[in-house]
Amino acid sequence: MARAVGIDLGTTNSCVSVLEGGEPTVIANAEGSRTTPSIVAFARNGEVLVGEVAKRQAVTNPDRTIRSVKREVGTNWSVDIDDKKYTPQEISARTLMKLKRDAESYLGEQITDAVITVPAYFNDGQRQATKEAGEIAGFNVLRIVNEPTAAALAYGLDKGSKEQTVLVFDLGGGTFDVSLLELAEGVIEVKSTSGDNLLGGDDWDQRIIDHLVKTFNGEHGIDLSQDKMAMQRLKEAAEKAKIELSAAATSNINLPYITAGAAGPLHLDVTLTRAEFQRMTQDLLDRCKGPFEQAVKDAGIKVADVEHVILVGGSTRMPAVTELVKDLTGRDPNKGVNPDEVVAVGAALQAGVLKGEVKDVLLLDVTPLSLGIETKGGIFTKLIERNTTIPTKRSEVFTTADDNQPSVLIQVFQGEREIAAYNKKLGTFELTGLPPAPRGMPQIEVTFDIDANGIVNVHAKDLGTGKEQKMTVTAGSSLPKEDIERMRRDAEEHAEEDKRRREEAETRNLAEALQWQTEKFLAESGDKLPTESRDQINEALGELRSALGGQDIEKIKSAHAQLAQVSQQAGSQLYTQQGEQAGATGAQAGGAQAGGPDDVVDAEIVDEDKK
């Protein structure tokens, strides 16, 4: 049976895990790290760079490096690179393809099935877009799972049959949510979830960047925010400073040659204390309180009844965040899980559940936001309340607002506001062909169906005529199937192109190495070779130098093979020649030792013990 992987597709970093012998294993990437930066860059030569290599070149290539794209998922955002528009789905797919390649390299087999996680507070459009990113990357997305739910699954699977209440506080690079779950006898039931999709570690970084820009402007009168390369350096420095301040009381941010003024190059040197950092980010910390209180209220659980608190996301390592969670819950967070990896581990376990590898586990998730339609007066009429366990199906009968109304326009929204326009519009469809009738007479049944991925289907039916209309809510950002297929093919072509580039680089490296070794061999031993062999090597060496000066890889391969052959022959000749010389020298030495009778000494061996 083909393996399935679990993927935490994060704002800042991503992680992939797989079940091995029933136990989840986090897969290290090609660079040896257990997490991969969610950064994609388009090099000038057309190569697509992902992860650590993309991060390393960001300073010199700021316009073509995309990070934190998860914040744009489910929107109409796009980026232009070389006159081509890339959607958030396509950029996310590049990161997923990198994780897929690394997993396949580790496992030694093709991987197609995956469970991908999303923030619990993602709406329908964002979930659809994440699923599409997986499809573009070549995955069959088995399930979209909420990150806190995956974390609870990873944490709670081995906790036995005792019923317990768990609070998951998930503060990642770009999103934040809080979930309350009940765990008992293999059943993991989400009671409530709340969050903020625009709050995360990136915002803490931005405060440091703003502080550095303001400080530098005050000292030198130069606004670094207008310099893209400088801003990339500030971004990296801010992230490092934030991490340092989790362990140290101060952090020195030193960036030489950050820009140039009238008098010459200028350097940035700022010391930031933890107290100062916490003061400038206090309002961000305060924004975590609202979703926490909402989740507790919706679950109908007292804070005192929460038995375990799990921290998820790298941003929870900040001391101020840990202290906030301790203050809100009255207990120390659990230290037994890795906040960077626990979500991917849970996703791998859920993949195991779906594949039948993990038994006796039932995951009951919820929809994070209420779903409904717009009715007369612009009112938002809810059909499915937030925190309803999914999958679920609800129906309600509506009627017309005007006499002889020939059709009904059904506008689907997701959110909590009473006025429909203030909520997130998911889609619109029309039920036509209604027979003339006074208002209030037609009976139109509207049914909402949410699947286990949290993706919505809506169905409207005129009970009088039997006419019906269906739609899968695709939101404004979702892509038509043909676009997904086209993007998947593009991604595959890029993968082939990247593979070809790697092979070309390896061929060139091997050829250059052989060239150097041969030149060294000639310098050290060329005078010992027969003239014919030396001429053959020089001729082959010249052909390889010429080939390396061009771009024809086949020519380089051919010249490399030819030089390898003649070099090997020459090496064999030299070895044989040296062996013959050594034999001759040995024979001469042996003859010298085997002298005449004058060289013979008569002697007795005396055994001292027998004396």
Swiss-Prot record:
Gene Ontology molecular function: any one: unfolded protein binding
Top-rank taxon: Bacteria
SUPFAM superfamilies: Actin-like ATPase domain (SSF53067), Heat shock protein 70kD (HSP70), C-terminal subdomain (SSF100934), Heat shock protein 70kD (HSP70), peptide-binding domain (SSF100920)
Listed Basic and acidic residues bias regions: 480-508
Chain segments carrying region Disordered: 467-508, 567-611
Summary of the function given for this chain in its UniProt record: Acts as a chaperone.
Name of the protein in question: Chaperone protein DnaK
Species of the source: Salinispora arenicola (strain CNS-205)
Gene name per UniProt: dnaK
